[in-house]
Amino acid sequence: AATCKETPPTWSGHLFEISTDNPRRADISYSREEKKIDTTDYKGVPLRTTLDDYATGTKYCRKSNLTGTIPTFGVPDKLPSPAGPHYLGGKLPSTGVLVLDFYGEK
């Protein structure tokens, strides 16, 4: 069975969702220590920035309540770096987050 190690408590990266219906590109900054996820969506130019503040339970952009705990993200064991496309957080294809390349230390 696939296992996942958690990512470092603080990271940032680029998100690419390739889809004919709703493609997406975003920059994400994640801090488990501050319990915040900062997301800027793009379509050529920045469209919107949201901030999920799990410390206060508030989501900013359109202010709304935020419930639950901050999500953790994982990297599968024995993942070479860089390694091409991999799904993180799921044991089966298409059940997690697709990552095209992972750079960094485990």
From Swiss-Prot:
Keywords: Glycoprotein, Lectin. Probable heterotrimer consisting of an alpha chain and two beta chains. The alpha chain can probably have different glycosylation states. It comes from the Eukaryota. Glycosylated. This is Halilectin 3, beta chain. It comes from Haliclona caerulea (Blue Caribbean sponge). Glycans are attached at residue 65. Lectin with affinity for N-acetyl-galactosamine, carragenan and glycoprotein porcine stomach mucin (PSM). Has metal-independent hemagglutinating activity towards erythrocytes from rabbit and human. Hemagglutinating activity is not inhibited by D-galactose, D-glucose, D-mannose, D-fucose, methyl-alpha-D-galactopyranoside, methyl-alpha-D-glucopyranoside, N-acetyl-glucosamine, N-acetyl-mannosamine, D-fructose, alpha-D-lactose, beta-D-lactose, D-lactulose, D-sucrose, fucoidan or glycoproteins thyroglobulin and ovalmucoid. One of its GO terms (molecular function) is carbohydrate binding. Optimum pH is 6-7 for hemagglutinating activity. Activity drops rapidly at lower or higher pH. Thermostable. Retains hemagglutinating activity after incubation at 60 degrees Celsius for 1 hour. At higher temperatures activity drops drastically.
